[in-house]
C-alpha cells in the first residue's frame, strides 16, 4: 500500500512538471484566435458600471471564474493550493481541488485540506473524483469526500484517452452511465461533469442532460493535452508511447464543445475551459453561452511563483474581460451573446 501511495505522489509531481512543457500544449489546435467579437466604436456605457456577475447553481456569483482542478496528494501540493486558495479568498473566484482519489483509501489524506479550509473558510470549493473511481465507490463514501472538504459541489472528471495512455491507467469504464445516474439521483450536492481536454459530443451532452447533471465543463482541445503528458511518462512503453503520438490531436475543441452544449438548450449550466488563456478568450465563451469559465495552466504557473502572482493573473483576466465587454458595448455578460461575429 505504501508503494502504491508513493507511485501516486510521483505521478502527481510528474503531472505538474509535464503540464508546463510546451510540447504538451495543443496550442496549434486552439480555436479562440479564429473566433471574433463585434467591435463597437461607440460603446454607450461607463467602464466602471460593467458587471461580470454570473449565475452558478441558480444563485448569483460576483465572479464567473473557477480555477480548474489541478493537483493534490503530494508534498508540493500544499504550498500550491495554499496560494491558489488565498488568492480565491481575496477575489471570490471558485476552485476545483486536485484528485481526492487517495482519500478513499487513506484517511490521513483528507487532512491535506483541513488547514487550508480553516484558513480560507469562505472559498467556494468543488470536490474531485474520476469517473473510473465513481463506478466502484459507494455514494456514502463520495458524500464524505464532499462533506469533509465542505465543498459546494462535486466534479466528476472524464479522461478516457489519458487512462489509455497512462502506465497506471484505469480503463474499465463499464457501468459509468449507471453509476453517474445513481449519483445524480442520490447525492446531496450538485454534480458537474468535466472532460480533461478532449471535449464533448452532442450525443454525450444529450445523455448528460437527460440524467440531470447540474453543469458540464466542456474542457475541450486547445490547452494542456493529457494524452501527450502520459505519452512522456510512458517513454519506456513503446505501445503507449506510440499511441500517445498517434492521438496527439485527439478531441473536440473548446468552442465546438461549447456550441454542442448550447445547441441543446440544456437544463445544465455550460462551463467553458480548455486552452483558455486570457479574459478575451473567456469573453468569447460567455458570448457562446457559457456561465462559468475555468483556468488551469495560467494559474499553476502563477502559483509556482507566489500568491501575489496568482492575484495579478486574476486581476489581468478580469480587466481583459471587462475590456472585451466595453469594446463590444456589453454592460453585463448576457449582452455578449449578441456580439459574436457571424
Swiss-Prot record:
It is found in: Cytoplasm. GO terms for biological process: isoprenoid biosynthetic process. Mg(2+) binds at residue 163. GO terms for molecular function: FMN binding; isopentenyl-diphosphate delta-isomerase activity; magnesium ion binding; NADPH binding; oxidoreductase activity. One of its GO terms (cellular component) is cytoplasm. Substrate binds at residues 11-12, 99-101, 162. It is an enzyme of class 5 (isomerase). Keywords: Cytoplasm, Flavoprotein, FMN, Isomerase, Isoprene biosynthesis, Magnesium, Metal-binding, NADP. Its main location: cytoplasm. The keyword Magnesium applies. Belongs to the IPP isomerase type 2 family. HAMAP family: Idi_2. Homooctamer. Dimer of tetramers. This is Isopentenyl-diphosphate delta-isomerase. It comes from Legionella pneumophila (strain Paris).
